[in-house]
Amino acid sequence: MSTNNSVLVLKVGGALLQCEMGMARLMDTAAAMLANGQKVLMVHGGGCLVDEQLAANGMETVKLEGLRVTPPEQMPIIAGALAGTSNKILQGAATKAGIVSVGMSLADGNTVSAKIKDERLGLVGEVTPKDGTYLKFILEQGWMPICSSIAMMDDGQMLNVNADQAATALAKLVGGKLVLLSDVSGVLDGKGQLIHSLNGKQIADLVKQGVIEKGMKVKVEAALEVAQWMGQAVQVASWRDASQLIALAKGEAVGTQIQP
């Protein structure tokens, strides 16, 4: 991949944080891209760590339509797990791979506007792009921002944002190419086979059939939103698959292409 000005927005799932080899492989891929002049922005969740921390504090995890319900009393624990532990674990892996990274959250640099998404979800945020100055400065230095999905409202209230939706807002902000990486190779059909390409109508049909549901529904709808906004395909792929990462580094299509 030659030097270019486009930004590759990599969203990584929380399950990655529990796989040291997967993290090392992904960061090596990112390091190779950065060395080639490709700007890389990483956005992460940390669901597994959040679940562990909540359980350790005697609290339970409740999800509604694939989104984590966030009561006010859970917010400090969720913020600590995402903006703290998860972010620093990924930064540590980046440092080990020789990457200069900047750990940040959606609350930094006036990057996004945040509001309550749905009262039923508690302190769950919906974010829209606001000011790209801070992010663009970091990217122009050849550094890699590693952004957690904790946002802040104008009154200082912290909000928990779904990481796929956070990556969507940041991809729009920097005009980047979005790749949603999880622990599955892409969107699978009812028989567990990889679907290579999907458009809005096909997605709606698969949601109706119950083939795409919960977290994957949130992921695919976030991907479709960016695909339509940018007028280009968004990839849903796996960090577990070394061959997908190599193809990704070469700028090739991997996983499922969500078409505008």
Swiss-Prot record:
One of its GO terms (cellular component) is cytoplasm. Pfam families: AA_kinase (PF00696). Substrate binds at G46, G47, R68, N160. It is found in: Cytoplasm. InterPro entries: AceGlu_kinase-like_sf, AcgluKinase_fam, ArgB, Asp/Glu/Uridylate_kinase. GO terms for molecular function: acetylglutamate kinase activity; ATP binding. It catalyses: N-acetyl-L-glutamate + ATP = N-acetyl-L-glutamyl 5-phosphate + ADP. The keyword Transferase applies. SUPFAM superfamilies: Carbamate kinase-like. Its main location: cytoplasm. The record marks K11, K219 as: Transition state stabilizer. It comes from the Bacteria. Its EC number is 2.7.2.8. Pathway: Amino-acid biosynthesis; L-arginine biosynthesis; N(2)-acetyl-L-ornithine from L-glutamate: step 2/4. Signal peptide: none annotated. Belongs to the acetylglutamate kinase family. ArgB subfamily. HAMAP family: ArgB. This is Acetylglutamate kinase. It comes from Shewanella putrefaciens (strain CN-32 / ATCC BAA-453). The gene is argB.
